[in-house]
Amino acid sequence: MPSKSIADHHAGYGVALAIVALLLIHGTALVMIFSDIKVGSQPQDLKDQLSYPSNYDAYTSHISGADHGHSEMWTDINPPSRKPLHGDSLDIKTNEEHITLSSPRTSTKTTNENGHEKDSKDIKFSFSTNRHPISVSPTTDIVSIAVSHNNPMGGDTWQVSRNGPNTVHVPIYGKPILRLNGEELSTQIAHMSMWDELAGSFKTFAATAESFHMITTTHLFNKTLHKDVFFVVHGWHGITNDTHIFLSAVRLLTRMMPTSCIIYLSWESQGAIGTAADAILLARRVNITQFLSAMPSQLRIHCMGHSLGSYVCGSICRQYHSLMSGICKGILGINPYEVLFSAPDLYARMHVDTIRLDAEYVAIFATTSQYLSTSDSDADEYIIVNDAVFMNSVCANPYEWNIHLCTTGYGELKSCERFGAANVTTSPGVVEDGSQICLRMLPIIAVLQSLDLKSSYPLLRIAPPDASNEVTHLPSIWNIYVVGKDYRYSTYAKNDSLWYSSAICAGDTGFSIPSVFTVFAPPSISLRVRAAVQQSSTIYKNITIYSAFLKNTSRYYPTVTLETLGPILSAYAWRGRMHNSSYYPLPLPEQEIMEYKCTHIDRTYTCIPTDLIYATTVWRQIFSMGHIFPVYPSNNCLPYRPTNAIIWRRPVLEIGVWNNITASFQRNKQLMALTFENHNTATNTTLLTFHDVCRESKIRSVVYFEYDWLETSMNITVLIPGLYTLRWFFPFEIIEMPVRVSYNNSFAQALTTSRV
């Protein structure tokens, strides 16, 4: 792609620049991400250059127009200009900071750069001519590169740390899995059911070792095909029996996940039909140890539980750990506190024994935030889905509600199931509001909707109640295939619970997952998005970011009306999907992004989609088709494709060769990527993405780079004179800093001495 001037690249954003100019004139401080960037002398004892292999996208198609956000890294992001002379300068003043908004490109690789949020401090520079080596020690937690202390004039100039350049060491993420003692478990036998596709019926059996051998000999369990066992567990049956809802769910899961063994677990005989108080206690004592003991040890265990079934999942995983010393891959709890609507005084009892330690990844899918608070520690991620309007409309006729759910998965697998009031029965003599039953069942169906490759839930990070210093509005994607947190964010390696909001639109033909509409605007204006399920905003420096879940029910991006006098700076919409391509077999979540063009009409803005669609990968661990697809790279960093951003341009930094730039930034900021543009060779190289240092042989002799992820700091040393640009990418902004490197007297002296 040909390079563009700054003016050309940002055409159409004159309003944005005007607003920013006014802010600058009035002396508004442009608060920056970095708490400190300083320049010091670099120790001249580097050794052993990093050797960078090819990028992660080995399977990317090179066919024009087939780009899905997985293409060659940074091929069209800030394309370098012509090769400058050493005396040339960039078109950036040396005493002023510039801000603008990134703009879309018109090629098939449309890229709108990206950045982050919340208050932060200005970049500060301090210059030093001290040539004494600084002390650099390898970190013990997350280490990318460590500096050796050999003669810098001989051999290579890099040394990879013993842990490798791309290893993420999780300081506190290892979970102490709890074991159950045999005497604590129920002596009653639970029952299980599986769908037999050949027979066209369900097979029900006791949860014993003999039963596992039976399903093996009858090929319900296939040793060759089945790599995962996926338990589905119902909740409290003291008032309502929803067995048929779950059997329909099991049939759908069996058809959509052919490489997984899907098993429905009924625990009525072990306490599910008792009182709510008893059921809460007995859910942790459900016993299937005999069945688990007969299973091959290499199987991966997953469990999805509704209401108290979430805690039964925890019991299953503890038994599995006690028997096999294995750890469940994931637990998905659907409205686990639902029973509290009948017995709110039992809240404390449910939190005595958390399920969060029972699997590698625990997610809670909830349609209400009631009973969820910062004291909750039951999940790695909470997915709070707004359902108030649409689910109530589905349940308007409480005894005739009906949903026909159809999903399309990998390999064009398609299946449909009908869920409705006819699938639910109530206990004799018990009268319950049918609409309440309907509202309890819909979250199960909402989770099953995400089996469809185009129906992943768009997520926006929210702060838990009473929490402070949370990074909100960070986007992500979630669906039933997810078995790991979002790798892109620093919270991947922390034990903090993450909270996300999402939304859903329900109808008698199934569910539709809404798109998210995002607007960048000055902080002084009032703005409301029409036809939104929910909306929120956050003030980010001198920009306000508005986000709203649109309640459109089609697969198409709608025209959006903004109630505001403006001005607005930028707008786009995005939704979640799973990548599905013959060219790139990894089934990873993606954020599909549509650029919008907005026109001011009277007291509103009308925003129309531009048909410029691109996608960026959301790196989460996924299980599908018999495989767990890891997200962390084996020998290189992962591609990062940014969305929209505020661009902050810093003055040119003048330094000498071998001077060290140390950049540190606030811990609550999320660095997504760092690129290094070499104007001398017209190349742009990615130095890191997320937690991983990239490997690129072309820059072996040009730059030294060291990244301390835990300490949120880095050292950068340029080894050859010339003109360069460093770009730090955050979820909502980009920091650009031109660097002019030249020989100085101290370096020339050292060079002469070394040569002698």
From Swiss-Prot:
Sections of the chain in a coiled coil: none
Keyword Glycoprotein: yes
InterPro entries per UniProt: AB_hydrolase_fold
Superkingdom, natural source: Viruses
Signal peptide positions on this chain: 1-30
Major subcellular location class: secreted
Known glycosylation sites: 222, 241, 287, 423, 495, 542, 552, 580, 660, 684, 715, 744
Compositional bias of kind Polar residues: 100-113
Keyword Zinc: no
Annotated region described as Disordered, given as residue ranges: 96-120
Compartments where found: Secreted
Gene Ontology CC entries for this record: extracellular region
Transmembrane segments: none
UniProtKB keywords: Glycoprotein, Secreted, Signal
Misc. comment: The recombinant protein experimentally lacks lipase activity. Additionally, it possesses an uncharged asparagine instead of an aspartic acid residue at the catalytic-triad acid position found in conventional cellular lipases.
Role summary: May play a role in host immune modulation since the protein is secreted and provides an advantage for growth in vivo while it is completely dispensable in cell culture.
Record-given protein name: Virulence factor MDV010
Organism: Gallid herpesvirus 2 (strain Chicken/Md5/ATCC VR-987) (GaHV-2)
